[in-house]
Amino acid sequence: EAVANDNNWNQQIKQSVINAWSNAFDTGNYGPYNDVFPQVDWWDELVKPGFSQQYNVNISGGTNFMRYFASIGYQNDGDIYDLQKQENFDPRNYYRRYNWRSNLDFNLTKTTSLSVNIAGKMGYRNDNFADDVYTRIIAAPTNSFPIKYSDGYWGDGSTAGYNPVCNMNTNGSQLYKTFQGWYDVRLEQKLDFLT
């Protein structure tokens, strides 16, 4: 602090430290997993393009007596965070849905018809427990600590800032499962002969 108060900014960081960093950059001896010269672009390490997939298969047909329609579908909304499934839990955010529908229509007689409709969906949503991720990615220091040290321990964010990669991979997650099903049966009798 005294050096800063005296306006000796060139003495804030020792020349040997400046030279060491300069040499590290000149030789490429730095990076997100370098113990001595960490240089982490937290956004590039943690964020990737997201994706969404949707697939559907439909069949239909029939005769004068019976008509049918069946549909099955799958939707997968992937994660924008570059996370991998862990041994004990899955830190990735995603939503997966399976849906189905089946309609059967029968002409029992010229005036009587029967319809049976069945539909449903099953959903799986996985949410990461990490909070305020964007702010923490932007606020994390780029050269205070690596993502992980060479001994396998996470870069220490307790004194020099926050390690968002560690947080996203260790805070846990919750898997929500949902199921909804519908069915209806309709019998229709025309009563035109009464009028």
Where are these regions (language model features)?
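Alpha-helical support elements that line or immediately flank enzyme active sites
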Residues: G61, D184, E188-Q189
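N-terminal, post-signal-peptide soluble/periplasmic segments
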Residues: E1-N34, K110-D127
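Short glycine-enriched, charge-decorated loop/helix-capping segments at active-site entrances
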Residues: K85-D90
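Flexible loop and strand-edge segments within Gram-negative outer membrane beta-barrel domains
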Residues: Y33-G73, D77-I80, P91-N163, N169-Q180
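Short N-terminal signal/transit or membrane-insertion segments
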Residues: A2-N7, T142-N143, D184
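Short, intrinsically disordered, charge-balanced linker/junction segments flanking boundaries
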Residues: L191-T195
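Enriched - but not universal
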Residues: Q12, A24, E45-L46, G157, ...
